[in-house]
Amino acid sequence: MDAAVASAPIETIGNILTQTDKILEEIKPDAILIYGDTNSGLSVIAAKRRKIPIFHMEAGNRCFDERVPEEINRKIIDHTADINFALTERAKEYLVAEGISGDRVMVSGSHMEEVLEFYAPQIAESDILNRLSLTANKYFILSLHREENVDRPERIRELAGLVNALSEKFKCKVIVSTHPRTRVRLEAQGLQDNDVFMPPFGFFDYIALQKNAKCVISDSGTISEESNLLGFPAVTVRDAHERPEIMDAGGLVMVPLKTDKIINAIEVVTKLSIKNIDPVLDYRGGQVSRKILYSVMSYIDLVNRETWRKRQ
């Protein structure tokens, strides 16, 4: 699907729909399972036109700010899907409030705990700290990629200034896992330092870096789940947030991309004990993959029968 990426978001979405439709025509799947809220999730439109049952993981997340492109995607995907799997009870409540029938929404919980447990040996074996000459609790890991943070020149300059400010204030090394989108914006501003702005890390290395960092600064959605499950201090750099349950648990601090606010947040989260953070119960419990698998297998026939009037 990388070939679908274009210079303009609408062109990318058009390419996704065209290419997905060709794949669906070729393989004729019994169902399609969509995860998340990225542009690729809009392939639900192609699947719907072909009368293919659609299941959506991570449904019902809402930040209630339609300036965020992912918020628009979430609503389109949720309302197009036949069955929605919500991470939390609150996410289900949002969907029901929007008019989606409660019997088409299931609370699956987060798959992240299961993923982290399954890959724990590989994460433990990561030698990324040695390769980067890092000492545990003596560095920051930073990753920003969202439109609100990197698509305006002044925000990119703020990001570059933030890296220098963190290094000077805390006397720690700053490692930036640089999303391709962010790198393009940095290069356009003439801001390049390959010792700081590194290519994206693989999953095992990145989790190992997060677990051992003094603090993680990120605009990723999954930082909420990872910080709560693994117990590391984190600051999320966002103007709006779609996972309020982590805020309820006191699991992280949300601030905009302003250097002084981020530094203040880091000072707070690194001083308070992270061992006493309330667990988000919906993030825990495991066996999410089994729940999803069993539900998909169980509901394909129902969707075909009730939505598309197909008879076996």
Language model region names:
Residues 1-101:
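Active-site and donor-binding regions of nucleotide-sugar-utilizing enzymes
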